[in-house]
Amino acid sequence: MAKATWSALSAESANLATPLNGVATGTTVFIGDIENTTNKDFYLGLWFQSGSMSPTSTGSISVILRRKRGSVYAENNSEIQVLGLTGTGSRQVNLAASIRIPYAATWGLFIQNNLGATIPASGNTLVSFTWNEEVN
C-alpha cells in the first residue's frame, strides 16, 4: 500500500459525499487535498452513487486533480478522469473510476457535476480507496 495522506480521510474508505450534496450541474467542488509523499505513483479509486434524482439525469461526473503549490491550485496542471456516463433517464447515478496520483506532490481533488441535473441534497455516497502501482 502506498504511504500517502489525505486530509479529508480518517480511514482508507470513507463517505466523502457531503461536499457533493445539492451541487448544481456544471459546478465543480473541492473534496480534499491528497499528498503523495512516496517516490511512486499510486491510484485513487472512487465509487459514486447518487440519491434519487429529479429530473432524471444523463451525463457524467468528472474527477479533476490540480497540483497544489502553497495554497494555490494550478488549473493548467490537471489530470482529469470522467466517471463514465449514466444511462439515459437514470434516476440514480452509479459510477466508478480510478485516477493516477503522481508522486512527490500535493494535489487538490475536485469533482465536477456534468449530469445535467442537481445532485440530490442527501442520499449520496462517495467512497475512495488507494493502491500503489506495484500491486497492479
What role is predicted for each listed range?
Residues 1-15, 113-136:
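C-terminal interaction-tip segments
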Residues 56-63:
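Short coil-to-beta strand junction motifs in C2/discoidin
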Residues 31-33, 91-100:
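Exposed aromatic-hydrophobic patches
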Residues 46-55:
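Short amphipathic, basic-aromatic surface patches that mediate peripheral association
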Residues 1-40:
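Solvent-exposed, flexible loop/coil segments flanking beta-strands in beta-rich domains
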